[in-house]
Amino acid sequence: MIKNPFISVISQEEKEENKGSVEYQILSFTNKIRRLTSHLELHRKDFLSQRGLRKILGKRQRLLAYLSKKNRVRYKELISQLDIREPKTR
C-alpha cells in the first residue's frame, strides 16, 4: 500500500530525469498543487495555503509557457501525461 501517491511519482521520475529540467520542475509543482488542493478541500479557511497555491500555479504557468515556446512537442506530451489543461492564451 502506497501511503502517499505523490511521492511515488516523484521517486520514479527522479531516476529518469534531471531535477533541474523544466519537465521535472513542472511535475513537482503539479504534485504540490494536487496536494494543496486536497488540503484546501478539508480546510477552506486556510488562507496562507491558498496564497501558496496561487504562487505555485503562477510558477507552473510560467514554466509551461517557456516550454511551449522552446519545444512544442515536449510541451504537448507533458500536458497529456500530467492531465493538465492548456492555459488560455490572451
Curated annotation (Swiss-Prot):
Has UniProt tagged this entry with the keyword Nucleotide-binding?
no
Q: Which Gene3D superfamilies match?
A: S15/NS1, RNA-binding
| Record key words, sorted | Chloroplast, Plastid, Ribonucleoprotein, Ribosomal protein
Q: Which CDD domains match?
A: Ribosomal_S15p_S13e
GO MF, one annotated term: structural constituent of ribosome
Q: Which InterPro entries match?
A: Ribosomal_uS15 (IPR000589), Ribosomal_uS15_bac-type (IPR005290), uS15_NS1_RNA-bd_sf (IPR009068)
> Where found, per UniProt?
Plastid, Chloroplast
A Gene Ontology biological process noted in the UniProt record is: translation
An annotated GO cellular component of this protein is:
ribonucleoprotein complex
Main subcellular location: plastid
Ribosomal protein: present as a keyword of the record?
yes
Q: Which family does it belong to?
A: Belongs to the universal ribosomal protein uS15 family.
The record's listing under PANTHER family reads: RIBOSOMAL PROTEIN S15, BACTERIAL AND ORGANELLAR (PTHR23321), SMALL RIBOSOMAL SUBUNIT PROTEIN US15M (PTHR23321:SF26)
Assembly with partners or alone: Part of the 30S ribosomal subunit.
| Record protein name field | Small ribosomal subunit protein uS15c
Q: What organism is this sequence from?
A: Nandina domestica
Lineage, uppermost ranks: Eukaryota, Viridiplantae, Streptophyta, Embryophyta, Tracheophyta
Which gene does this sequence derive from? rps15
